[in-house]
Amino acid sequence: MSIPFTIGLSAYLYLPIRAAHSPLMNWGEPSTLERFLWHIGGKQYRVWIFSSTEAAGQQLKYFVDSLPMEFAYVGVVIGLIGLAGLWRGSRKLFIATILLFLTCVFYSINYDIHDIDSYFLLAYFCVVLWSGCGLFVVLSWLNSRLRWNKVNAFFIICISLLPLFVHYGRSDESKNYLVEDYTMNMFASLEPNALIFSFQWDYWVSASYYYQLVKGVRPDVAVVDKELLRRSWYLKELEHRYPWLIQESKIEVEAFLRELYKFEHNLPYEPNIIQARFVGMISSFIHKSLDSRPVYVTSEIDAEFTQGLQRVPQGLALRLLPDNEFHPTTMPPLKFRPFARSGRLEDMIRKLYADSFVMRGVYYYRAGNSNEAERAFREALNYDPANPDPKNWLRAIHR
């Protein structure tokens, strides 16, 4: 068994080989033994594993609540029958699958992230195996009494097709263009050769890398994920893609990397110092780029990174300017294809659109242009009708 197991692991050798040849995005930079082990061991994500019993309880509740629906309820019932059948017919397989199921669930519930479903795949696979055994038990029982092969075949077909009818509506993404549209609209909000800082990873940053590197859309824009800046490999990635950004702030980058080395290598470090160096580095990126290119942030970037600068709403982003004057801006035509389904990601994208119009409305309201402000607040409600902020501002205008 050791030889097939080793052959299976050999697929990981692709990572250091490819990383050594300057790929389009060298995620984790697994070109050395240390970084290779960090990469396959998920070192970057360990801060979210075994973080708290409260998080584990929430994830366990989510798993238990969602499991029956994953198998259209009937699948779980048949799976329990199959589990009982395994106990009688194959005790070793029963124990093996129970251990796989429990260890998968125990490990996964201790990972405090939103997109947890894929980490339960092994547990789902065990339920599928139990369901298959359950079908065998049920059909064997029916066949021994009825001997109606056509009925048995019809039963199998119905059970197999049931999840398709139950899940199709909530799994169909064929008309979901929310991320694509939001990414293109964000690009449309930025002037040529722009630099933008954001950590809206799920909503447009990750998609922007695909559109830039694969499709060649807006390669002039430097998109920087603020949270990935906490990783040394990402700073090397930026040095490869945007050498001017790192070179102009070399002193601040090196000061941060000295502290980051301690954190990444589990050495004693001062949280206040590493955070101060982190803020100083990003502030340097921003201030040293203002004279040569338009610089933007998205709304979630904290004010400590942009001290002394005005945030001017421009499309879906905020342009940073070193003055307090009013700068009239235009909202680019936004392509928005609605998607009826609700969910964490879908609802947040609608809110991000609304928030952009609210910020625009507030900017114009404070400049004394109530008409433009009202238009912006009403537009915000078109994207997120339940959002209280534009409603409150509209009441303030008409007070």
Where does each model-flagged region fall?
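Hydrophobic/aromatic-rich transmembrane helices and adjacent perimembrane loops
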Residues: 95-98, 106-140
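Signature aromatic-anchored transmembrane alpha helix within multi-pass, membrane-resident enzymes
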Residues: 87-91, 133-165
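C-terminal luminal/periplasmic domains and tails of membrane-associated envelope-modifying transferases
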Residues: 184-195, 209, 215-399
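Hydrophobic alpha-helical membrane-interfacial segments at the cytosolic entry of transmembrane helices
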Residues: 1-16, 154-159
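Hydrophobic, aromatic-rich transmembrane alpha-helices
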Residues: 70-91
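Extracytoplasmic catalytic-loop and juxtamembrane helix elements of membrane-embedded
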Residues: 14-56
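Membrane-proximal, lumen/periplasm-facing interface regions of secretory-pathway glyco-
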Residues: 113, 117-120, 152-191, 201-206, ...
